[in-house]
Amino acid sequence: MYGRDPWGGPLEINTADSATDDDRSRNLNDLDRAALSRPLDETQQSWLLGPTEQKKKKYVDLGCIIVSRKIFVWTVGTLVAAALLAGFITLIVKTVPRHHPKTPPPDNYTIALHKALKFFNAQKSGKLPKHNNVSWRGNSGLQDGKGETGSFYKDLVGGYYDAGDAIKFNFPMAYAMTMLSWSVIEYSAKYEAAGELTHVKELIKWGTDYFLKTFNSTADSIDDLVSQVGSGNTDDGNTDPNDHYCWMRPEDMDYKRPVTTCNGGCSDLAAEMAAALASASIVFKDNKEYSKKLVHGAKVVYQFGRTRRGRYSAGTAESSKFYNSSMYWDEFIWGGAWMYYATGNVTYLNLITQPTMAKHAGAFWGGPYYGVFSWDNKLAGAQLLLSRLRLFLSPGYPYEEILRTFHNQTSIVMCSYLPIFNKFNRTNGGLIELNHGAPQPLQYSVNAAFLATLYSDYLDAADTPGWYCGPNFYSTSVLRDFARSQIDYILGKNPRKMSYVVGFGTKYPRHVHHRGASIPKNKVKYNCKGGWKWRDSKKPNPNTIEGAMVAGPDKRDGYRDVRMNYNYTEPTLAGNAGLVAALVALSGEEEATGKIDKNTIFSAVPPLFPTPPPPPAPWKP
């Protein structure tokens, strides 16, 4: 039978397909019956066989928790496997040889730094700590100040002996402590890398603890302060036992040690002592109580110096003979700069940036000694210290004009150090003659080396590649080359092929003008004149005063290693302080231990932008 497909094709009724559909339907019905019968069979079986027993899970009771035994075994196994793996790795790490990169040997500047700091241990007065590390030194000067009847100063134990004698001159001692503090503030990372940070801070504190005894540091104002302990007067044939007539170990001193005070013109001494205390307060800023004590003392003594105008050395013959101060205006700027950094009080900045202050200090004079930084003249150091403020904080009006002047003058000083300009003569061996051929030149050259290196680091930190000398531009590397040339000369790169730092290298001075180093520690007490035989002996000193930088050669690079010729062989606190500062500034460059610390010195300085105005009063209708 045929029909027609409505889409155009034939439409057949296929009987075969129809039959197949019937068969398929019957098969499906059979499957359904089979599916229904299977659970019935299982049910019947359960009646006959009984219920199937379920397999019980096993657990482990750990006391605080119950866990599956399977999980417990898996966890323990994992931990054991991890422990075995860790042990295996540890065994490999410990047994397999490791190849460490070799630590570069310390450079000469770092080696010399260790020794130069040790000199201060040898110069300590008072009851020495057990770790002083100078075997031939002992307690000394324990009666200092105690014999002064009617005096406020009953305890002046401590501090440092100035040079080869046992006098404590507070003016150069304060300068030495300021230099040590300045070097720590700028280069604490280098001290830390050299393992000397704790040591140098202990040396500074030894000095500042003593300074706090030299005036009434707990008062709000003072009328005098100590300038000197001990005497060296041998004028007019004076034979009274004192620190210059006698030649004795400091430990054996039995003569009177007079105390000299200053109650008239003390501006230079007071301002320098303020600089020492203020700079040290930054070094010890983490010790809040001690730092606060130092700041208070610095304020009191600086104000005293401003009130009692005059040179401290004008009133005493000994001070004018040994450490004569040429003026006090440079100390006013130097001390005032440190007071500003230590306190953040803008009053100090206003004071030291007055043009008249700079004029009195000789900032515009020039002259043959302009740029010579020393225990006497602090102007070059003060100008660099204030150039730092302009470079990194740029305080602007009203300080910019005078700070720019200080900065320009600092650049001129740096130009004067370069050999191309012939401002200062040099020996044939290359030593700069900042004191124009006078004796004891090394103390001035190390100071110049420090200032040059520090200015170079300031410029580098300010992303400034150099500076101008007239129309010519010079890289900061030129300053470091100058500094290295001076320190290398002192360490042995000179015509005599000898080191002027005792204990550095194999050839160095053996007849140092120093009482303690020249007399053996042999349980024999040599009296005032009994020690003369050691003073006049031609034999080398029995004790090595390690790290002492002697006065130095003459203008012809000549050197006489004669104990009694102090112009060649005597070391000083001020000289060694400059040496330490220059050495740490140049040290560690191969190990990349960092350069200056830009921020620590500004810890107490507040923001220099104007205070914003107060908010307006609340609006009311």
UniProtKB/Swiss-Prot annotation:
Cytoplasmic side: 1-70
Record-annotated active site: 165 (nucleophile), 513, 561, 570
Organism field: Arabidopsis thaliana (Mouse-ear cress)
Family: Belongs to the glycosyl hydrolase 9 (cellulase E) family.
Free-text tissue specificity from the UniProt record: Highly expressed in roots and stems, at intermediate levels in leaves and flowers, and at lower levels in siliques. Expressed in xylem (at protein level).
Lineage: Eukaryota, Viridiplantae, Streptophyta, Embryophyta, Tracheophyta
Gene Ontology terms, MF aspect: cellulase activity
Name this polypeptide is given: Endoglucanase 25
Record membrane topology: Single-pass type II membrane protein
